[in-house]
Amino acid sequence: MTDSRTRRGTLVRRGGICRGLRNVLGMTTGRHAALGALALVLGTSLLAGCADFDESTASPFTPEPTNQASAEVQPENPPPSTTPPAPRTGPLGPCQDADTAVIATCLDTTGGLVTLPDGNSGLVAERRTGRIMQVAPNTTPVEVAKIDVDGSGDGGLLDIALSPTFVEDNLIYAYVTTGTDNRVVRIAPGDTAKEVLGGIPRGASGNGGSLEFAAPDQLMVLTGDTGNPAVAQDPGSLAGKLLRVRSLTPNAAPPRPEVVLSGIGNGGGVCVDPGIATWVTDRTTLEDRLQRVGSDGTVTSPAWTWPDRPGVGGCIAVQGVVAVALGAGKAISALAADPGTGAITTAPSAVAKDTYGQLGGLALGSDGLMWASTINKTAGEPGPNDDKVVKIPMPSGSGGID
């Protein structure tokens, strides 16, 4: 079966944040309209409380590279709507939802999520079953591939990422838990998974991890600490780290990956803001964190913390605006970073608070809207149609969740 998709990565005065957001808001045209649209709407929300600081000297705009995963020319995308779609009317059958923002229902608890370039479909991982499902509105989810995983505890099929040359090779990279370790594998539809990087320690808990391509030859791999914070500080262990993997083909003796960041708790998500920073979310016994690795390697740790531990998960980063899925927090948290320092000094705004339950995966659609996957079957209070993939309406105002 052939599919295509896109990928889905010090305190300063508040004026720097506001100027940076205004710079982003002026960068919403061109072939990367989806990224600009996300930054536009999130940025507008976060700007609501900004004072009128001097707006001179904007940083140059570097557009995010995209994978050309479809040979067809995609239509120009309209700006995202802030108005929820009208509810469906008439009798509903099994696994049908009255909310038209719901894209797919009756999934097993989810792992990673990505969107396809048509803007109307995506791929979502089922964490416990190891299935990769193609989902679209008003369409029954279809299994694209399946990987043997150990879905006990918090392990299983944890995240997926598209090969940079997917249009030619149809390869999907995945971060998975097996009976002996956590590992990175790759798989094509209808094929079996091949190991790319193995030997990452696994545990009864703390197996959370994530994948994101920073460049065609660089796969960022976030690994959990297996419930043992000491291994996250151990340079000899691959657990509790952000790794840069350059060997992307199956190899009996792959080279050891570069350790970019140590001290990770239970991995949440990794997202790349091209040319600016790589962002990492993780969960510790004391707090949940958002950490930043600048393009020059400078680490801001943490860039933001949540002492109430809302369960940070997948993330999206666009021109200094970061969106983070929250599990126990039952929302998406949107944060704005100063474009020069990466500092976050303004409390996040909350999106879709208490609307769909616990959220885990997060992706960007080609129309600029966020897609999220729920994890209610294992972490929340599941309804009859859980778990789901939903398209989240963007905020028109601001609210706080800290």
Give the role of each language-model region.
Residues 242, 291, 296-305, 388-402:
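Predominantly five- to eight-bladed beta-propeller fold
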Residues 91-98, 233-235, 287-288, 296-302:
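Glycine-rich phosphate-binding "P-loop"
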Residues 227-278:
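Loop-centered beta-sheet repeat module
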Residues 1-54:
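Secretory targeting and sorting signals
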Residues 165-167, 249, 285:
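Acidic glycine-/aspartate-rich tracts in secreted/extracellular proteins
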Residues 271, 279-281, 285-327:
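Flexible, glycine-rich surface segments
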